[in-house]
């Protein structure tokens, strides 16, 4: 990953989350990262993000298929499909994520899905 390539960074993010490499994943984010998901509490800071991936994420055994990545300045928009398990049950849904970069790190992340909550 290069600090100046948002597309490479977001693609690396999905690889790391699918491989459950959360230490490397969290390193892609700014220390004061803010992660927002409609209907869910906001996650603020690297430690809260790490805790979310280690303990609070309801999705498991899954993979992301990326359909599109669009970069405009310091923002990368990603559209894709997630397939995996939610609370032990098979699940598949579409998602759109927006990653805002500052100094080569993901500073803000917004996730939207075609489900009520994940």
Describe the predicted segments one by one.
Residues 1-23, 27-28:
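Short, low-complexity N-terminal intrinsically disordered segments enriched in polar/charged residues
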Residues 2-5, 36, 50-118:
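A beta-strand edge to alpha-helix "cap/lid" segment located at domain peripheries
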Residues 10, 37-40:
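Conserved short-loop catalytic and cofactor-binding motifs
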Residues 14, 41, 68-70:
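Structured beta->alpha junctions
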Residues 19-25, 47-56:
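N-terminal short leaders/motifs
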Residues 29, 41, 51-53:
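A generic structured-segment signal
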Residues 39, 43-44, 107:
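Domain-scale activation on soluble regions of proteins
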């Amino acid at each position: 990953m290069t600090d100046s390539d948002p597309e490479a960074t977001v693609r690396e993010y999905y690889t790391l989350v699918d491989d459950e490499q959360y230490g490397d994943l969290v390193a892609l984010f700014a220390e004061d990262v803010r992660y927002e998901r409609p209907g869910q509490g906001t996650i603020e800071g690297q430690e809260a993000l790490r805790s979310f991936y280690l303990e609070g994420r309801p999705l498991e055994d899954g993979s992301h298929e990326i359909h599109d990545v669009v970069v405009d300045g310091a923002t990368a928009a990603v559209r894709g499909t997630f397939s995996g398990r939610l609370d032990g049950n098979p699940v598949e849904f579409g998602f759109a994520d927006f990653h805002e970069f500052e100094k080569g790190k993901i500073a803000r992340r917004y996730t939207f899905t075609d489900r009520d909550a994940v």
